[in-house]
């Protein structure tokens, strides 16, 4: 038994499909299947039920998967401890980002991070919050940049900046001549929202419910750009995070208005596993991003 065998087993448990598990491990399906059988022979127990077309784990298999996850997390810690003995800001770093942050934040920080930490090899992974937290917990990610939610409280959260949300309306909307909109004015309105799984959806819905607004259930978007295009087409209004909003008050048929009483906003944070030996690396990374974004966010509020 070796570490690679445990990685195969955990991948199979996550994907419940031999080919997809093999692809995620960058090996052929016969290689992964063969190693799982060898693991069963070595342990003397059946880990999988092979009477079904589905991948079903036996009770012994499920127990071994959980223990394998623990072992792999500890191996990750050992590697981090070894890395800590060298230069803190060098070597590989796997960073996760949510889709409503990544496309808009990365152009602002990546060139700066490359200049500041030239020896840092950054690998960027985009996924929804629940997926990022699972990958962070399993050790696949070193840290993640996301909007703080209840589920992220199990990790160390380092706030980076607060990001306001702006109301996006079509250019012929009755409110298009306003300078800003009170949240109470949204009472009775129906807003376009992202589909389930996006934390921004839950946050925006919360602000809308407080204001007496509701969701337009005729359509749910997969991305902010789809929401923007639906607004431009006159199909509704929505809340968009400030980083995704252009500096112009109006562009491409969409008018962007600040909201107040209260100002809807979310906190963007860098999160990492508690007890990580590379805490100094993550804190330094967070400090650098926070300092850079502080000035940028101030320009957006003007």
From Swiss-Prot:
The UniProt keywords, alphabetically, are: Activator, DNA-binding, Transcription, Transcription regulation
Name of this protein: Hydrogen peroxide-inducible genes activator
Cellular component per GO, a single term: protein-DNA complex
Q: Which domain of life is it from?
A: Bacteria
Family named by the database record: Belongs to the LysR transcriptional regulatory family.
Per UniProt, residues of the HTH lysR-type domain are 1-58
Q: Where does the signal peptide begin and end?
A: none
Q: Which SUPFAM superfamilies does this UniProt record tie to the protein?
A: Periplasmic binding protein-like II, Winged helix' DNA-binding domain
Keyword DNA-binding in record: yes
Q: Which residues bind DNA?
A: 18-37
The GO molecular function terms of this record are: DNA binding; DNA-binding transcription factor activity
């Amino acid at each position: 038994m070796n570490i690679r065998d445990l990685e195969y087993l955990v991948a199979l448990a996550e994907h419940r499909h031999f080919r997809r598990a093999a692809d995620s491990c960058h090996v052929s399906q016969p290689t992964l299947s063969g190693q799982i059988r060898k693991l069963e022979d070595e342990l003397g127990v059946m880990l999988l039920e092979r009477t079904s077309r589905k991948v079903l784990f036996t009770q012994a298999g499920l127990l071994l998967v959980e223990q394998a996850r623990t072992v792999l997390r500890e191996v990750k810690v050992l590697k981090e401890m070894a890395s800590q003995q060298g230069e803190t800001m060098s070597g590989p770093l796997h960073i996760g980002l949510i889709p409503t942050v990544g496309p808009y934040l990365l152009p602002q920080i990546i060139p700066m991070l490359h200049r500041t930490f030239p020896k840092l090899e950054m690998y960027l992974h985009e996924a929804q919050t629940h997926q990022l937290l699972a990958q962070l917990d399993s050790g696949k990610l070193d840290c993640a940049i996301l909007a703080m939610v209840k589920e992220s409280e199990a990790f160390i959260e380092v706030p980076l900046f607060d990001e306001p949300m702006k109301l996006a309306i079509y250019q012929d909307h009755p409110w298009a001549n306003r300078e800003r909109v009170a949240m109470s004015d949204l009472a009775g309105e129906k807003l376009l929202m992202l589909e389930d799984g996006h934390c921004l959806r839950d946050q925006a819905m919360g602000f809308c419910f407080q204001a007496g607004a509701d969701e337009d259930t005729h359509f749910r978007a997969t991305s902010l750009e789809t929401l923007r295009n639906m607004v431009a087409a006159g199909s509704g209004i929505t809340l968009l995070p400030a980083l995704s909003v252009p500096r112009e008050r109006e562009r491409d048929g969409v008018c962007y208005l600040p909201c107040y009483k209260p100002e809807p906003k979310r906190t963007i944070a860098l999160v990492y596993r508690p007890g990580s030996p590379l805490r100094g690396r993550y804190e330094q990374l967070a400090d650098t991003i926070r300092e850079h974004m502080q000035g940028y966010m101030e320009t957006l509020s003007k």
